[in-house]
């Protein structure tokens, strides 16, 4: 590496490369050389491995072979996509000087830096998924977190109240790139993420952040955005903006505001609950059989992204929810007319971001034109609708007749992919361009006339006029007739059977045509930039329009889904109540081959907790999840899968359902479950919906039962949350007798011989048995094992009954974990004994039995 750093020992070109590389040491440097982007030294070695491209050498520099790898310029996006997916970044270095006037290496400079969180190119983005850049700040005062979607301009900040809240936000936003300060102490929280960027402390300075943000928004202070006093959030937001400016190296007019998020505005769903509910990602990491897979039939990518944001951030504002419900109800009558129009609108949101960054391609402008053409018809469809919310959306959508006229006049119907290909600007838009094009386009007629004239004058029937990319224009004659050509014909190329010539007249025309093509392309590029200048003053209203169009797509999609899937409009209330008649699981009912059994649920202050019993595979988890999903759907304004629903306002949705070992963190299944349970007990309120499934499994019977009992007590007596508590501890079914507000329900099953039929229907009261052996048989456990288990079960039950011993029962009035409790299990056992009737052998057996309890 020492020889690399001694630039004077290298060739001028390598000196230029090394100087540029020293300015960007942590990213790949793609160095433009002709038709290739080249990488050298360590960049070449790593790129060869990551991108599966050939590693070669480019001679020697300072006596050392130079490792080199390269990719053709026209497929650079494909390789950049691979890199950003791996969390890598790349600096793109272009030739900006004129080779004909350059002394030494052509001038080059880095024109942009492509990072996972700052990409806007269509080829690099997932079309139906937000791509976020995030920054996190931590100090003694607390935490700050900010996100920016550069492909839309959406800029958000918040101040998580604790570590768990930050963890929830990281899981919800899932940033592609995360910036953190040198002093950040919570490395364990982020170290497993890709795209981590350690940034200098000064980028998070509060005053620097204020200056950056005010400069971006053209304001004197940030009071109007409501973030002036949010110091922790501002630090994170300031670092984000600085980083984006450094990487994009252009103005960012589409980033127009910073919105401060408040926890109370949304229904909080922690990381574990979000995973368990499978909103947009299933437990295997895929997208199949998720809520989004059923609900998302949007026709624009920006609508799909907005719907997913709604699912991950349900809201609590009743006014907004009622407006959405009203709009959906109206759109049920016109959704079929709207969808074809919205489909042609396309991804206007991201097109506008590329316009703002001045990276929009010709086809982006053509798609923008197509979107504008749909707006009058969208207005026609919705003008008669009485929904106030739809009227508001229509006013925000607007119409852009002047811009539509500009794009119709300026851009050809089907433009090429890139402006450098030429042929983008329509004929008639610019007189000078048309003049130069006419000269170039007239070449065909001129060459035909020249060929006819020369063939006639020279009487050479094999004479032809043509063009070659290397040698230019030529007059071709067969070798057999070549002796007949006149003296002013100058030989240009000799082939096997023909000779090619040039004459002064053709050479003069060639120079004129080639000049005209270059001139026409130069004018086109200038006109293309002028079109940007004409469009950009409207970027604010265009962004408002695209956001409204995306919401219209979401609402019309929810209207169609409500019709197709037989959803009903829930009644929303501020009370702590959930009353659902004929509730269904939105995903299971669509993917199951069996008819789905709908079930009711009733939760209220007088009926706070349901103790749910029944067999495994009986439907307990489905019943619990469907309740949470129905409540979630109601809090995005959607209709819900039920016959009737009254949904009260909730502040949080917690689920403790299923778990697996966290091997990376060294945590057992039981530890994972207890961690999730602790989070619920610390953060749930009486306005929370809590789903608890099989608390206490994974440890001894008494430990597990004690934990389950204490959790149920705490949730019902102290927290008073609306709780669904599924369990196999039948002792818990006695809780309704001890605590008001707890009710038993069970999932019904029918057993006949060795077979069991799950009815999947919910009934009041506790289950009579667990059906564990029947479920084991259904799972394929060998019959001889089942028979032995049944025999052993009968023996155990007989032994307990014979000795007057029943299953343990825990009273609600005593703290379960009190060390000096007189109700210790051993004491309870001893109290059941009758020493006067026991033989010495019986007494010895009891001692052994008591030993096994420990």
From Swiss-Prot:
Record's keyword terms, sorted: ATP-binding, DNA damage, DNA repair, DNA-binding, Nucleotide-binding
One Pfam family named in its UniProt record: MutS_II
Gene Ontology biological process terms, A to Z: mismatch repair
DNA-binding among keywords: yes
Organism superkingdom: Bacteria
DNA-binding keyword on record: yes
SUPFAM superfamilies assigned to the protein according to its UniProt record, in alphabetical order: DNA repair protein MutS, domain I, DNA repair protein MutS, domain II, DNA repair protein MutS, domain III, P-loop containing nucleoside triphosphate hydrolases
Gene3D superfamilies per record: 1.10.1420.10, 6.10.140.430, DNA repair protein MutS, domain I (3.40.1170.10), MutS, connector domain (3.30.420.110), P-loop containing nucleotide triphosphate hydrolases (3.40.50.300)
Binding site for ATP: 614-621
Annotated GO MF terms: ATP binding; ATP-dependent DNA damage sensor activity; damaged DNA binding; mismatched DNA binding
CC terms in the record's Gene Ontology section: cytosol
Function: This protein is involved in the repair of mismatches in DNA. It is possible that it carries out the mismatch recognition step. This protein has a weak ATPase activity.
NCBIfam families: mutS1 (TIGR01070), PRK05399.1 (NF003810)
Family: Belongs to the DNA mismatch repair MutS family.
Protein name: DNA mismatch repair protein MutS
Gene: mutS
């Amino acid at each position: 590496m020492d020889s690399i750093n001694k630039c004077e020992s290298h060739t001028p070109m390598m000196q230029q490369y090394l100087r540029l590389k020293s300015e960007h040491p942590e990213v790949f440097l793609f160095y433009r050389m002709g038709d290739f982007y080249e990488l050298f030294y360590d960049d070449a070695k790593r790129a060869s491995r990551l991108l599966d491209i050939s590693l070669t050498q480019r001679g020697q520099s300072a006596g050392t072979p130079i490792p080199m790898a390269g990719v053709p310029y026209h497929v650079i996006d494909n390789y950049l996509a691979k890199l950003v997916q791996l969390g890598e970044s790349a600096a793109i270095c272009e030739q900006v000087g004129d080779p004909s006037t350059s002394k030494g290496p052509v001038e080059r400079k880095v024109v942009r830096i492509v990072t996972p969180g700052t990409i806007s190119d269509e080829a690099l983005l997932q079309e139906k998924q937000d791509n976020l850049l995030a920054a996190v700040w931590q100090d003694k005062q607390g935490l700050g977190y900010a996100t920016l979607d550069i492909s839309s301009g959406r800029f958000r900040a918040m101040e998580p109240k604790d570590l768990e809240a930050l963890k929830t936000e990281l899981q919800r936003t899932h940033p592609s790139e995360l910036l953190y300060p040198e002093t950040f102490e919570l490395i364990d929280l982020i170290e497993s993420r890709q795209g981590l960027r350690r940034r200098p402390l000064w980028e998070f300075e509060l005053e620097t952040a204020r200056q950056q943000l005010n400069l971006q928004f053209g304001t004197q202070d940030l009071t109007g955005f409501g973030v002036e006093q949010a110091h922790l959030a501002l630090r994170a937001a300031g670092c984000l903006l600085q980083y984006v400016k450094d990487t994009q190296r252009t103005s960012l007019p589409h980033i127009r505001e910073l919105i401060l998020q408040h926890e109370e505005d949304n229904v909080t769903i922690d990381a574990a609950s979000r995973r368990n509910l499978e909103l947009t990602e299933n437990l295997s990491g895929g997208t199949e059989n998720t809520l989004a897979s059923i609900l998302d039939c949007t026709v624009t990518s920006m609508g799909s992204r907005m719907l997913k944001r709604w699912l991950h951030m349900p809201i609590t504002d009743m006014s907004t929810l009622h407006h959405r419900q009203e709009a959906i109800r109206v759109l049920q009558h016109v959704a079929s007319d709207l969808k074809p129009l919205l489909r042609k609108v396309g991804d206007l949101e991201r097109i506008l971001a590329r316009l703002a960054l001045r990276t929009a391609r010709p086809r982006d402008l053509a798609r923008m034109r197509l979107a504008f053409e749909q707006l009058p018809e969208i207005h026609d469809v919705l003008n008669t609708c009485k929904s106030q919310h739809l009227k508001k959306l229509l006013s925000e959508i607007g119409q852009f007749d002047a811009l539509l006229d500009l794009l119709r006049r300026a851009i050809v119907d089907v433009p090429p992919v890139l402006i450098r290909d030429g042929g983008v600007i329509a004929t008639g838009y610019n007189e000078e361009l048309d003049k130069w094009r006419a000269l170039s386009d007239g070449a065909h007629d001129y060459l035909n006339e020249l060929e006819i004239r020369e063939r006639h004058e020279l009487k050479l029937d094999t004479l032809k006029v043509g063009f070659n990319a290397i040698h230019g224009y030529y007059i071709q004659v067969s070798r057999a007739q070549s002796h007949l050509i006149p003296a002013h014909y100058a030989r240009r190329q000799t082939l096997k059977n023909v000779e090619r010539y040039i004459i002064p007249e053709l050479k003069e025309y060639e120079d004129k045509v080639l000049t005209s093509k270059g001139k026409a392309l130069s004018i086109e590029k200038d006109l293309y930039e002028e079109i940007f200048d004409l469009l950009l003053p409207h970027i604010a209203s265009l962004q408002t329009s695209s956001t409204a169009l995306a919401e219209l797509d979401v609402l019309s999609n929810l209207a169609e889904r409500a019709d197709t899937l037989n959803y009903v409009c829930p009644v929303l209330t501020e009370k702590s109540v959930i009353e659902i008649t004929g509730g269904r699981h939105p995903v299971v009912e669509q993917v199951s081959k069996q008819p789905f059994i709908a079930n009711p649920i009733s939760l209220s202050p007088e009926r706070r907790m349901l103790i749910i019993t029944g067999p495994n595979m009986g439907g307990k988890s489905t019943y619990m999840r469907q309740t949470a999903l129905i409540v979630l759907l109601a809090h995005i304004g959607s209709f819900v899968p039920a016959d009737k629903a009254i949904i009260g306002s909730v502040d949080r949705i917690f689920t403790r359902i299923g778990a697996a070992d966290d091997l990376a963190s060294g945590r057992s299944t039981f530890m994972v479950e207890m961690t999730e349970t602790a989070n619920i007990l610390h953060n749930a309120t009486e306005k929370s919906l809590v789903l608890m499934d099989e608390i206490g499994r994974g440890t001894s019977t008494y430990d597990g039962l004690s934990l389950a009992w204490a959790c149920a007590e705490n949730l019902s007596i102290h927290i008073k949350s609306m709780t669904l508590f599924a369990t196999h501890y039948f002792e818990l079914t006695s809780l309704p007798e001890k605590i008001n507000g707890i009710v038993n329900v069970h999932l019904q099953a029918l057993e006949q011989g060795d077979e069991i039929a799950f009815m999947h229907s919910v009934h009041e009261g506790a289950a009579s048995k667990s059906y564990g052996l029947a479920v084991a048989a259904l799972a394929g456990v060998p019959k001889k094992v089942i028979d032995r288990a049944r025999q052993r079960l009968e023996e155990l039950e007989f032994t307990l009954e014979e000795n007057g011993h029943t299953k343990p029962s825990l009273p609600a009035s005593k703290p379960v974990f009190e060390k000096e409790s007189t109700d210790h299990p051993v004491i309870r056992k001893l109290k059941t004994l009758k020493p006067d009737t026991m033989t010495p052998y019986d007494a010895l057996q009891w001692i052994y039995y008591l030993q096994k309890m420990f």
